[in-house]
Amino acid sequence: MINSIGNCISRRSCYSLQIYFDFSGYCDMAYGIGYMFNVELPVNFNSPYKAVSIVDFWDRWHMTLTRFFTRYVYIPLGGSRRGKIRTYLNVMIVFFVSGVWHGANWTFILWGIINGAANVAHKIFSKWIDRIPKVLRMGITFVFCTFAWSLFRAESVAQAFELWNR
């Protein structure tokens, strides 16, 4: 039992790191090629796995896409200017759109909904969440992201549930 739990945690953690290293590595190559041609590209990652909350994670991960969704989806919807309920709805819409953007599959849509719900929950409960020690919040954030990334790996929602139940 303990071996299978350790195996499960190890596999999922490695997949989280694989996604980061693959994507961040591609960005690093693009930065290098850009510098060769005297083109400075915007930073796209800022140590996302050091994030202390899911909101902090999304401020650090794929920052150019986050800026795009903020500018062209969140702000036109009203951003946070129309009250808390509308803000929460706007956050959910942005993450839903992000899920669809990543792929036309229910796994990506569920990934967007889960991340949107986590962001909304953090906004609602941040007063209490911020009392948790920083290192524990970092661990919780990493575990959540690892859980959510499994939806990228799964071919179907049913397969994702199988992965989560192992």
Predicted feature locations:
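Membrane-embedded transmembrane alpha-helical bundles that form the catalytic cores
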Residues: 1-166
